[in-house]
Amino acid sequence: MTLWCVRTAIGCVFFLGLWFAPVSAGVDREKLLTDSGVYGSFAVFALDDQWGKLDSSIRIARLATLKGVVEQHREHVAIDLYLLRGLSDHADVLFRIHATELRDIQAFLLDLKSSQFGRHLRTAGLMHGLTKKPTYVPGFSDQMKADLTSPSEPGPKPYAIVIPVKKSAEWWGLDREKQVAMIQEHTAAALPYLKSVKRKLYHSTGLDDLDFITYFETSKLEDFHSLVLSLEKVKEFQYVRRIGHPTLLGVVQTVDEMIESLVQ
């Protein structure tokens, strides 16, 4: 089946499915991605063995329900999709979902799993975090604060990496001054890669078995590799009890791109 046929078939199925559905304005995605106090969940799924045995026309119809669920919940949640297949051995797809209420994320995931497409998804992992105002930045030097405001390089950053982190009990027992000094060293090591590697931090303590979820986007995986090597050399790294497990690597995709990838 050609790409044009796939797009046409998906469009027809989706259009018919939403003929009588109300149109919602959609949540303010940029606000959710920049505000503090926003929940972020990472839902990782693998497709079951039955998926590959389905006829392409059936896969198209079931993938159209994915688009329908995303559209249904866009008023309350911001949803980003990533194709992991071929780059990560843990799963096939990743959903990063933001909302001001965690129950809105839960509602989306419940509807996703109960959809015709979702019935082929096996949950491979689920992580939850919360965005907060920078904890240590107020104690940084003025120059470092200014450096942190540098804009990232223009252009798409197609690769996404998700790395969960857990700190040791010793870290949480350190006094504030020592923590600030070590995080400032950590930040100094990361500054050379600030423009080519976008980073977002989620706080997970109490919401998950993690302390942090670190999310990265880049078009230069070699820079990300160098960034990780640099961060492993700073003093703060000795207090990291768990990093990765899993480490997720994928490609950013729109809903339509994801559908085209999975229908093949």
Model-derived features: where do they sit?
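A cross-kingdom feature marking solvent-exposed beta-strand/loop segments within repeated
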Residues: 62-64, 76-94, 195-200, 210, ...
